[in-house]
Design a protein with these regions (language model features):
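N-terminal glycine-rich FAD/FM-binding segment characteristic of electron-transfer flavoproteins
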Residues: 1-176
Length: 176
């Protein structure tokens, strides 16, 4: 069972973006996600944080900050130089369990399509794939947080819909 069961939902703060790099270069989806993440973070009044894994990638963090991220968490290790499912999943899930972001965006790249479901399964949380637009009903979301004292699904009551609304692309897209 998830570490987050019986955790106060207000303990989760911030919008995070997994920033993918290959051979020391940021991917175009990183900039799309930072832009979308900035809008969500502004709507919710929270920090936008990028999460960058690799080896000797500190310089890329400065570049991401210039695109609107408030903060970049950099996890560096020689074993993170190239993507491997197990290593990236372990590092990301450990950081997420410690820092507790409320939203995490992962690009729908080959790596993201492998990594996103594995992180969601490890963290016992949901995953919404193939989104091209994200919108949060801020008032309902805040009301939900005020009336819910636990992340235990059995205690959650939802009204007409969800608090995160999305649209699926007709012929592809790059956001997940």
């Amino acid at each position: 069972m998830s570490t987050f069961v019986n955790t106060d939902p207000t303990a989760f703060k911030g919008v995070w973006v997994f920033c993918e790099q290959r051979e020391g270069k940021l991917m175009p989806t990183d900039f799309e996600l930072i832009s979308e993440g900035r809008k969500l973070a502004d709507d919710l009044g929270v920090e936008l944080c990028g999460l960058l894994l690799g080896d000797k990638v500190e310089g890329l963090a400065k570049e991401l900050g210039g695109y609107g991220a408030d903060r970049i968490i950099v996890c560096e290790h020689p074993l993170l130089k190239d993507y491997t499912t197990d290593a990236y999943t372990k590092v990301i899930c450990d950081v997420v369990m410690e820092k507790k972001p409320e939203i995490m965006l992962i690009g729908a790249t080959n790596i993201g399509r492998d990594l996103g479901p594995r992180c969601a399964a490890t963290l016992h949380t949901g995953l919404t794939a193939d989104c091209t637009h994200l919108d949060v009903d801020v008032e309902k979301y805040k009301a939900f947080l005020k009336t819910t004292s636990t992340m235990d699904v059995d205690n959650m009551k939802f009204d007409e819909g969800t608090h995160l609304k999305m649209t699926r692309p007709a012929f592809g897209g790059h956001l997940m």
